[in-house]
């Protein structure tokens, strides 16, 4: 923490919260001039920071503490019955690791996902510039995991591979393949990949109890939440 204490951070002005409409949000960002090396990113992930594009951030709201960083310690994970069904349903998918890049196949999948799954969110309408700025970053730890069925692209899990685990940045998938539960499968695959790499945890971002889009994360057990500056197991 001594090294982190020397870093500069900047807070945004209060703005409407994307997840809880009745709340005002403030976000704390690492100084954009600070080089984002892998070890620094890993250290900040241990204290609840996330990456979006070229920025590392965490919530810093004055009157709300609903956003709580969550991670899955993979050593203790065992899929439940529903999760085993999802794994079986998608066992034939091929996963390919790629460097982040822009192409029309990726963008078409992203566009259809946003239009059909998140038309009520602040990422709608999608655009090529939005896709590139948000996800296509030339960073040494970032990769696209493609999920393909007989060559057809079904999903991409944008993932940061860190010394302490995998950080699940964003996953988008074919909205016409709802029966496959591809978002859940991507998390289950990332858990298995983290364990295969001998790493500690999958960092899932923020859990928000009263937000349907963000409270699904506690379906994965065991799970740890970053509360009062330490990771605690949710019981």
Curated annotation (Swiss-Prot):
GO terms for biological process: ubiquitin-dependent protein catabolic process via the N-end rule pathway. Keywords: Acyltransferase, Cytoplasm, Transferase. It holds the Pfam family ATE_C. Its main location: cytoplasm. It is an enzyme of class 2 (transferase). It is found in: Cytoplasm. This is Aspartate/glutamate leucyltransferase. The lineage of its organism: Bacteria, Pseudomonadati, Pseudomonadota, Gammaproteobacteria, Pseudomonadales.
